[in-house]
Amino acid sequence: MRVLYLHTERFSWEVKEPALDIRDEPVSGGASNALVVFTTVERGDVPEEGFLRQIARDIVEVAEKVKASSIVIYPYAHLSNELARPYAAREIVNKLYEVVKSEFRGEVYKAPFGYYKAFELKCLGHPLSELSRSFKPGDSRAEKKAEERRDLYIVITPSGEEHDPAKFNYDGYEDLKILVEKEVFKRELGGGSEPRYLEYMRKFGFEWEPMSDVGHMRYAPEATLMMELVEDYAYAVAKSLGIPVFKIRGTNMFKLSERAIESHARLFGERLYIVESDTDLILRYAACFQQFAMVKDWVISYRQLPFGMLEVADSYRLEQPGETVLLFRLRRFYMPDLHIFTKDLAEAMEVTFRLHEAIFREIGKLGRTYVSLYNVTEDFYKAHRQYLVELARREGKPILVRVLPGQKYYWVLNVEFHIIDELGRPREIATFQIDVGNAQRFGIKYVDENNQTRYPVIIHTAILGSVERYLYAVFDTLARAEKEGKAPRLPTWLSPVQVRIIPITRDNLKYAVEVADKFEAEGIRVDVDDRDETLSKRIRDAEVAWVPYICVVGSKEEAEGVVSVRERGGGQYRVKPEDLIKKIREDVRGYPNRPLYMPRFLSQRPTRS
């Protein structure tokens, strides 16, 4: 931030016309014996308490030295070429004004942000009447760290006991210890080598897109199919909660000039994607904007609550270039974002028990479990500690709780569910939050049983996590299996190709196609390797592709009406196609299905370089 101090005998301003879509109320004004602070907010400035208090104290110190009876904060975009975005600049100027008011004993004024203004001044002309300053956010890091240290971390057991994380006995709870090391003591463990899952990503066509921005992926046909299957499954899981769920679709760009959007965006901080057009637009970082913008126009009765709304939202977060991780930490990803609208906090807490059960059930289907971090506000912790104990009891193991002082959050509870990955690192996958602020921010209302207008409490959740992170958990599970000497095998419902038919010779191709037709008619994804390659190479290629059922057919199989099956991780056997179909249908029961996203015949597919 750059500021210019002018000690004036008199100063006045008059609002002329809007300069920005994001602006304050158009108020003209003036002051006598005023220290006028021409204020330019620069890129990289943050609305951080320590940073703003540092600036405010300097302003007040100068005002007291020159014996000014008032201070005027005057937004001024002409002291730097590195300007902050308007929404960020306005927030910082407004917060600076509030901090200066709390520090100064005289009158404090603020000229409105976002307008062309005329001003008149008479500078007093003494040695301290004209001063300039430059402030950097880094100077306030010590205060920020001190603020972080005020957060209280507690380990809560299923029996309700509380423990200091530094003194807790972690025997039998090694995963919790890893999470505590990272979250409480800020020690990142594990790593040190390339994770095995990256090799799997290349196999199925999950790749960075080098012609786009950092952190953007592309998805080959196999990867696209897997992504869309997970999207379908996320909707099915949401419907399994036993509440009505509405699935929607919307835009990914929203105007920062909308007060609710701008206010919500400020909560997210610096990781925003901004698009410059006729007006500043933000790329959404979750489905919140679209769902809330839609629901605010609905007429809702208490009888219709709770209900959910789901969108698989393409989401954008401006992660640091060195922090992006394929399939895990991305600048653009897909979030099956479910919001559940409830009457009040009590109902929201009751619904979260169902969510909690679903979250652990789904990760359990992958053969994994979570270790949990519960971020709670201090007031919520004091009022609802027993609720957290109940969640620990349901998990059957201790949980880590972080108690945050103050009321600066729109949520009262934000739960992170972590797996410990192949390299021993905590990796957040699923989440839920209880939100008590956004209904009022966006104007979402319902009518209660007494015909009174109320604001619902909103649960945010991704039961599976983002689509990419769910697949990350799948592939990390396979990496752990391979580390233990087992052949990695995708769940059959997620396998891009579920059955591959390999004719021994060209003479057997007709029978291979007939068998493939039977599988396809039953909704099973099947292809045929009709390439002019040796049988051993074609079998090997199918194994490398992790096809769960490789069916070799020759003259003998054709005569007997069977296929010779090589089941991944399950041995070899001969079976009629109809019996294998029954086995596969049982294997994929309860999961979504989509057709093959590639030509059936391998000879028609180009190879990737």
Swiss-Prot record:
For this protein, the record's CDD domains field holds: ThrRS_anticodon (cd00860)
Its GO biological process terms?
A: threonyl-tRNA aminoacylation
Region (Catalytic) residue spans: 195-491, 196-491
- The answer to whether the entry has keyword NADP is no
> Which Gene3D superfamilies does this UniProt record tie to the protein?
Anticodon-binding domain, Bira Bifunctional Protein, Domain 2, D-tyrosyl-tRNA(Tyr) deacylase
Q: One cellular component GO annotation, for this chain's record? A: cytoplasm
Domain notes for this protein? The N-terminal domain is an archaea-specific tRNA-editing domain that hydrolyzes incorrectly charged L-seryl-tRNA(Thr). Catalysis of tRNA editing is performed by the charged tRNA itself.
Subunit notes for this chain? Homodimer.
* Family statement: Belongs to the class-II aminoacyl-tRNA synthetase family.
| UniProt protein name | Threonine--tRNA ligase
> From which organism does this entry originate?
Pyrobaculum neutrophilum (strain DSM 2338 / JCM 9278 / NBRC 100436 / V24Sta) (Thermoproteus neutrophilus)
Lineage at the top is: Archaea, Thermoproteota, Thermoprotei, Thermoproteales, Thermoproteaceae
Give the gene name.
thrS
